[in-house]
Amino acid sequence: MKFKPNQTRTYDREGFKKRAACLCFRSEQEDEVLLVSSSRYPDQWIVPGGGVEPEEEPGGAAAREVYEEAGVKGKLGRLLGIFENQDRKHRTYVYVLTVTEILEDWEDSVNIGRKREWFKVEDAIKVLQCHKPVHAEYLERLKLGCSPTNGNSTVPSLPDNNALFVTAAPPSGVPSSIR
């Protein structure tokens, strides 16, 4: 895990670390998703994301993280859900982003040699299932949600205290619970 010297972790009222991530799509059809290499395990692919900084909104944090980790900018779309990881005490706000700009060189490619690659959604799920099943759940949730073209949000607009939480499945493969 990369930790910047000036980085401050933020936590919610229940002690969960606040994180944000984006499923970055090549187009609004949402059929190809961008994954990045892990900073810890460069041969493994992950969904770009990281900690929410103080005074930062989760959507802004998600856009910042994909800029730093994947070198892309785009149109931030709907909140897919808030995914809870009990083991690591994280709550990750996962957004959909349609990529509009791809940088040739970006912060993490220069500093740590991070790579990025486009995957068909089904292939990305398979790749993520091996070592980052929580990230695969983001894409599974996307498939269960509405079609990207019908204009409906997969998550209703709710205040933080009533937000939709998807709890990560235990390694045994028990399905996620929604509370």
Curated annotation (Swiss-Prot):
Binding site for substrate: R9, K17, K18, R19, S38, S39, R40, R88, K89, H90, R114, K132
Inducing stimuli: Overexpressed in frontal cortex upon chronic lithium treatment.
Residues binding Mg(2+) 2, per UniProt: E65
Domain Nudix hydrolase: 17-143
Cellular component, GO, one term: nucleus
Annotated cofactor note: Binds 3 Mg(2+) or Mn(2+) ions per subunit.
Gene3D superfamilies for this protein: Nucleoside Triphosphate Pyrophosphohydrolase
Major place of residence: cytoplasm
Short sequence motif named Nudix box, residue ranges: 50-71
Cited Pfam families: NUDIX
GO terms for MF: bis(5'-adenosyl)-hexaphosphatase activity; bis(5'-adenosyl)-pentaphosphatase activity; diphosphoinositol-polyphosphate diphosphatase activity; endopolyphosphatase activity; inositol-3,5-bisdiphosphate-2,3,4,6-tetrakisphosphate 5-diphosphatase activity; inositol-5-diphosphate-1,2,3,4,6-pentakisphosphate diphosphatase activity; inositol-5-diphosphate-1,3,4,6-tetrakisphosphate diphosphatase activity; metal ion binding
Entry keywords, A to Z: Cytoplasm, Hydrolase, Magnesium, Manganese, Metal-binding, RNA-binding
Cofactor: Mg(2+); Mn(2+)
Cytoplasm in keyword set: yes
EC code: 3.6.1.52, 3.6.1.61
EC top class, as a word: hydrolase
Function recorded in the entry: Cleaves the beta-phosphate from diphosphoinositol polyphosphates such as PP-InsP5 (diphosphoinositol pentakisphosphate), PP-InsP4 (diphosphoinositol tetrakisphosphate) and [PP]2-InsP4 (bisdiphosphoinositol tetrakisphosphate), suggesting that it may play a role in signal transduction.
Protein's name according to its UniProt entry: Diphosphoinositol polyphosphate phosphohydrolase 2
The species this protein was found in: Rattus norvegicus
